[in-house]
Amino acid sequence: LFHGVGAVDSIVDVCSVAICLDDLGIEDIVVESLSEGHGTIHCAHGLTPIPVPAVVNLCQAGNIALTPAPVAGELVTPTGAAIVTALRTSEHLPARYRIEAVGYGAGKRPYEGCSGTLRCLLVHADA
């Protein structure tokens, strides 16, 4: 996971997620599925199909569902897949919940027909 050009970026991403989750006191992480694009991407090993092998292996190991998106390009990086695989505690939201906060993150790559953003909700289950 930590080889190649993005090694430092990946380490910073993983550490940043850990710090944020700790600061917010997050105990459960719900991820129903990850939306993934299609096509190929150039990487250190040449032209590689999307999802790239690391994402395939991580999602398979973590039983993470991938939902095809009508987008040409990589939406799920190996670092993102590793974070979800390591931290997800459930694939289902509570039957009833209240939204306490919303956070958005945006990538740098432009995609046609896709915002390239990630939305996270901080929720509390309703009794």
Regions found by a protein language model. Give the residues of each.
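Mobile "lid/hinge" segments at catalytic clefts and subdomain interfaces of large enzymes
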Residues: 26-126
